[in-house]
Amino acid sequence: MEIFAEGLTSRNHRSAEVIACYRRAVEGLQKKLLVPADYTILFTSSATECWEILAQSFAGDTFVHIFNGAFGAKWAGVSQKLGNPVHAIRYDINAPLPDWQLPPSNWICLTHCETSNGTYVADNQIINIKKQHPERLVALDATSSLGGISIPWESTDYVFASVQKCLGLPSGMAVLICSPQAAHRAMQQGITTHYNSLANSLPLAQQYQTTHTPNILDICLLMKLMENIAPIYLIDKPLQQQAAQWYEWLAQQGFDLLISNDAVRSPTVVTVKATEDYIVHLKSAAAQQGFVLGNGYGEWKNTTFRIANFPAITAAEVMALQEFLLTFQAAKQ
């Protein structure tokens, strides 16, 4: 591979070569995922770290967390454990984002695609909540959406995602994207307690550097990925169409979808309900055929399985999995 042949992974992270990779990765994200040029792009170890960075870099701020699944709940828990005032608002998995009167806060925290249950907050809902609360900053966990579907950038201020989902890269890195408003607030507050505090990281990111030794391999792979993929507007629509086909096909074959409201179904994570015994046998049979079905998560751990609908998955792979599921379903009836 070119990255190894050029010796990039053995370079010092302050070297000109690695800085150039960082810069090209940033330029690629701006070009292919339409990240605004005035948003700052940083690299961290994980989405979980991004939860911590937010809470620690804006210590004392008040956070409203609106969620319906395990990852949104965990994020709220991190904000609270780190000492910030938190208003946690849980809503039903088959309902759209609640149109409630929100308590006062500095931040509104949303999960774009909730990986644990396969729900989705549509772009128009994110746009509306920003319009209703223009004075607040909006944080968006885009772990199961960045690189697969469009992000309403102008309505978000702190967007982050691990790279192993829609971006299809090895785990061990996350992309963190800050609006000018979020960056200004972080620098204004000037909290530098932690090595990864934004007040420490943002000035270095402007120079395509980090406060720590980053995952150089993933940065280089991200750079290459951005150079080779289509723009997000050419990825989003086919992925949405493939998701709709999955949901329609599963319903036609008698599978029980966890999310009954198609308006809030995730385009990237399809979640199916079944008995615990059925899922045990299904996953065993799938493994024998070379398929890996995702485990359930949280309260649905033993009674659901999840199907990834990421850009790297081909139509032939979808068809092969559907043929397997059809055969298994017929044998169980």
Residue ranges and their predicted role:
Residues 303-333:
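PLP-dependent enzyme catalytic core of the Aspartate aminotransferase-like
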Residues 256-286:
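Conserved PLP-binding catalytic core of the aspartate aminotransferase-like
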Residues 1-44:
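A glycine-/small-polar-enriched, mobile loop at the entrance of the PLP active site in fold-type I
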Residues 164-247:
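Active-site C-terminal subdomain of aminotransferase-like
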